[in-house]
Amino acid sequence: MSWKDTAEPLLVRMPAVQRPEGHVPFKRKLTWTGGVLLLYFFLTNVKLFGLDIDASQQVFGRFSSILASGQGSIMQLGIGPIVTASIVLQLLGGADLLGLNTQDDPRDQILYQGLQKLLVLVMICLTGLPMVFAGGFLPADTAVANSLGIGTAGVQWLIFAQMFVGGVLILFMDEVISKWGVGSGIGLFIVAGVSQRLVGGLLTAPFLGNSEGIIYTWYLFITGERGTGPVLAADGLQTVLLQGELLGLFTTVLIFAVVVYAESVRVEIPLSNARVKGARGRFPVKLIYASVLPMILVRALQANIQFLGRILNAQLGSMPAFLGTYANGQPTGGLFYFLAPIQSRGDWMWWLEGTAQPVWQILTRVGIDLFVMLVGGAVFAVFWVETTDMGPEATAKQIHNSGMQIPGFRQNVGVIEKVLERYIPQVTVIGGALVGLLAVMANMLGTIGGVSGTGLLLTVSITYKLYEEIAEEQLMEMHPMMRQMFG
């Protein structure tokens, strides 16, 4: 008896959002999407009952925007468990250990979806329990424990229960948008979090109870309330570029432009319809073929490694120096320091006197981060293409089933697949590595609002794809016959 026969009774009974029986009108899709986004914003402002907020620590740091996490809220875990479960499934699927044919076998498709949800529930527990009980990241409020009479341990379990509910909610919110809305729930949650930080980086001011945004900082420069020194001198130029966030603004605009341009770069394979004379089309293989979503997997893997290091440091008191040394919850040496991604200019600009590490250690850390993002971006892009039916074989079947063929070639799935194999694997690797390079460079130069480079890349790419999907939906609303072509 295989593992599929053993696990099938459980996996097929995993709760799921019902698929629409027919076509969902575009306006209704927008309603579902907007409603789920409003619910997400609401839940990120629902604080965990029983949490000592003043003593709590930021768990994910700058990874929070990528993981759509709301610090100290019921959305504390964000999409982290979903992403981690996807990493595990992609690694198992890539090694062909699951034995699931998700392309042609409906039973295996149901088992895969059930296994994914089961893994998400496991990851919610594996991520949430250490936050509450092991690392001291989310301490219980003793006043609440005394008033309820359940002790500190009881309040800790209460905090974990709320986080568990939040993790399950975001899982099904993502599924609702995927089936009834526009775009991907995970992508929209990331866009929502990053957009908040971008707007905050522009508009915040001390009198609003926040730090200084770009507009307020330049108001101080222009009115003379804050001096810059001679702009042509080194100190003055540094003040304008760094404190005035001109460098961050330039990087943000540059990333927007590069991603939009990269999304438009493509190889177009001509197609024709064998049954309808004169009907022609093109299949685009974009430079960023796998999208930037696989980059979430790379950053989530790094976030989990850093999370593990902080837990070990909290539990052991002090780890062996070769593993890691910590100050204020951040690695300052050892293996975990070298594996920590570059998050800001202060992590590597040693000439600003903001780093305590020797130059060789800083450069080694930069090199490791660059290597991880380039190789990881390419590898996870390949996994993503294969597991989302975007590979040559699955795409060839889709083209063949739609009645299209490549002019000058026989109408055969194998022939179409061979043509696609000339482009898709190579473009996937190049695009994944390019996205990794852009993410590292954006982090090193800094962006508006302290948004991570990966978060900015994700936001731009997801927004661009959302625009394309909305245009496609509107086209299908105007021409219902197009629904069969788009699927």
UniProtKB/Swiss-Prot annotation:
Residues 1-20, 89-110, 179-184, 267-291, 385-427, 467-487 are cytoplasmic. It is found in: Cell membrane. Residues 60-67, 68-79, 80-88 dip into the membrane without crossing it. Keywords: Cell membrane, Membrane, Protein transport, Translocation, Transmembrane, Transmembrane helix, Transport. The keyword Transport applies. It is a multi-pass membrane protein. The keyword Magnesium does not apply. Residues 48-59, 136-153, 204-244, 314-364, 447-451 are extracellular. Its main location: membrane. Gene3D superfamilies: SecY subunit domain (1.10.3370.10). One of its GO terms (cellular component) is plasma membrane. The chain crosses the membrane at residues 21-47, 60-88, 111-135, 154-178, 185-203, 245-266, 292-313, 365-384, 428-446, 452-466. GO terms for biological process: intracellular protein transmembrane transport; protein targeting. InterPro entries: SecY, SecY/SEC61-alpha, SecY_CS, SecY_dom_sf, Translocon_Sec61/SecY_plug_dom. Belongs to the SecY/SEC61-alpha family. NCBIfam families: 3a0501s007 (TIGR00967), PRK08568.1-5 (NF006341). The central subunit of the protein translocation channel SecYEG. Consists of two halves formed by TMs 1-5 and 6-10. These two domains form a lateral gate at the front which open onto the bilayer between TMs 2 and 7, and are clamped together by SecE at the back. The channel is closed by both a pore ring composed of hydrophobic SecY resides and a short helix (helix 2A) on the extracellular side of the membrane which forms a plug. The plug probably moves laterally to allow the channel to open. The ring and the pore may move independently. Component of the Sec protein translocase complex. Heterotrimer consisting of alpha (SecY), beta (SecG) and gamma (SecE) subunits. The heterotrimers can form oligomers, although 1 heterotrimer is thought to be able to translocate proteins. Interacts with the ribosome. May interact with SecDF, and other proteins may be involved. This is Protein translocase subunit SecY. It comes from Haloarcula marismortui (strain ATCC 43049 / DSM 3752 / JCM 8966 / VKM B-1809). The lineage of its organism: Archaea, Methanobacteriati, Methanobacteriota, Stenosarchaea group, Halobacteria.
